[in-house]
Amino acid sequence: MGLPWYRVHTVVLNDPGRLIAVHLMHTALVSGWAGSMALYELAVFDPSDPVLDPMWRQGMFVIPFMTRLGITKSWGGWSITGETVTNAGIWSYEGVAAVHIVLSGLLFLAAIWHWVYWDLELFRDERTGKPSLDLPKIFGIHLFLSGVLCFGFGAFHVTGLFGPGIWVSDPYGLTGKVEPVAPAWGAEGFDPFVPGGIASHHIAAGILGILAGLFHLSVRPPQRLYKGLRMGNVETVLSSSIAAVFFAAFVVAGTMWYGSAATPIELFGPTRYQWDQGFFQQEIDRRIRSSKAENLSLSEAWSKIPEKLAFYDYIGNNPAKGGLFRAGAMDNGDGIAVGWLGHAVFKDKEGHELFVRRMPTFFETFPVVLVDEEGIVRADIPFRRAESKYSVEQVGVIVEFYGGELDGVSFSDPVTVKKYARRAQLGEIFEFDRATLKSDGVFRSSPRGWFTFGHATFALLFFFGHIWHGARTLFRDVFAGIDSDLDAQVEFGAFEKLGDPTTKRQVV
């Protein structure tokens, strides 16, 4: 039988043994990829500077997912938070990678076994002796087992009852660590930024799944519903499974892009909305005003700002700044951050403090404009010097640095002032090493951007797959060419392939 490439899956349509085999092989490939990718990332990951060169700047993709579940130590003697480790144990990054690779091998062997021993009595109807699957019963079993797993994760792993807990941090991504989380059963549990909601929702969903599984194991579907939803057809299973997967993909694309407790910024990088809303800038401003209220000097106030917080307030860490087709990590774009130069304060010759207008997310270039505290334009870098009125030279702008490496240093040279004004457009000013990785200076997206793009794209494709297979199973008789005016109630091709001349057309 010659099948076109897009129809090859027909070979497992009525072959439950080999259907199991191909699913085992698929799981083996997924598990093997995860373990291998983890080992590759560990081989290229530099853990030496968790503040200025975190995992998300280095383009790590699977390490953040391991970390948010409680893995923080490596057999290489380092931990994600910067401490030295002597005995990482089996539940280290390498340990988890090895477990996935071993599991992949076992699944591979199981897939081969099921491919060879495909014709098991388990899959045959005792009454007819033909291959058949009790799909509603299988659905109940799967629902029950996934409910147990979901409940176990929420009740034991996340809460720390039997497990490490999950990664928890403050809203500004400064104090993150793995810790047990108590379930949040009130309205706050529905806040996507409250970690307790992860525990309570898994517990609640798990209980619901267990009860629903038991229901489907003990209650048979009515005949009208069974036939109406084509519950005897394995393509119905495919269609509804695709629906579950694309729905989950859309949800996680949203929680990743907009941010949530499940996608901490220390592991995946900040969101674009934190730049758009000046989230970190406002927190820095609040801290400076608080320090000034304690009669600290500007230099002392800015020196108290954590370098980590200042680094978040830099447009190069915005995942929406990198083009989707610019391959590579953020470090391959603007370079490896070496140090914070300090906060630049601009003043004109009349003593007005000037603020550089920050570049919006979707601009590649943006005019350099300096405004006073009332929003009045006082200086700029003109496009045409012949018509300029507010140039740095004419207005006499100087720049002073507070905190960071240039603390207390000021510049009045127009060329230098303009250089720092351009860089202040991009947020706090940092020094970057572009030589080590031959970085090209073009912004890249973070794993947050890649994950969102990938899952949103595949969710859309899977949505069409759901429609396609759902239509095929619901209108199977129409597509098979059965006369719609046929008086006899016929169950056509329930367990046999379409076009099989031995298929019985039995009047029900």
UniProtKB/Swiss-Prot annotation:
Spans traversing the lipid bilayer? 21-36, 101-115, 140-156, 203-218, 237-252, 457-472
- Membrane topology per record: Multi-pass membrane protein
Question: Where in the cell does this protein reside?
Answer: Plastid, Chloroplast thylakoid membrane
Under Gene Ontology molecular function, one entry of this record is: chlorophyll binding
- Record carries keyword Acetylation: no
Alphabetized InterPro entries for the sequence: PS_antenna-like, PS_II_antenna-like_sf, PSII_PsbB
The domain of life is Eukaryota
GO CC annotation terms, alphabetical: chloroplast thylakoid membrane; photosystem II
Looking up Pfam families in the UniProt record yields:
PSII
Sorted alphabetically, the Gene Ontology BP terms of this entry are: photosynthetic electron transport in photosystem II
Alphabetically list the UniProt keywords. Chlorophyll, Chloroplast, Chromophore, Membrane, Photosynthesis, Photosystem II, Plastid, Thylakoid, Transmembrane, Transmembrane helix
What does the record's cofactor remark say about binding?
A: Binds multiple chlorophylls. PSII binds additional chlorophylls, carotenoids and specific lipids.
Protein purpose: One of the components of the core complex of photosystem II (PSII). It binds chlorophyll and helps catalyze the primary light-induced photochemical processes of PSII. PSII is a light-driven water:plastoquinone oxidoreductase, using light energy to abstract electrons from H(2)O, generating O(2) and a proton gradient subsequently used for ATP formation.
Subunit structure comment from the entry: PSII is composed of 1 copy each of membrane proteins PsbA, PsbB, PsbC, PsbD, PsbE, PsbF, PsbH, PsbI, PsbJ, PsbK, PsbL, PsbM, PsbT, PsbX, PsbY, PsbZ, Psb30/Ycf12, at least 3 peripheral proteins of the oxygen-evolving complex and a large number of cofactors. It forms dimeric complexes.
Q: Which family does it belong to?
A: Belongs to the PsbB/PsbC family. PsbB subfamily.
The protein, known as:
Photosystem II CP47 reaction center protein
Species the sequence originates in: Anthoceros angustus (Hornwort)
Encoding gene (name): psbB
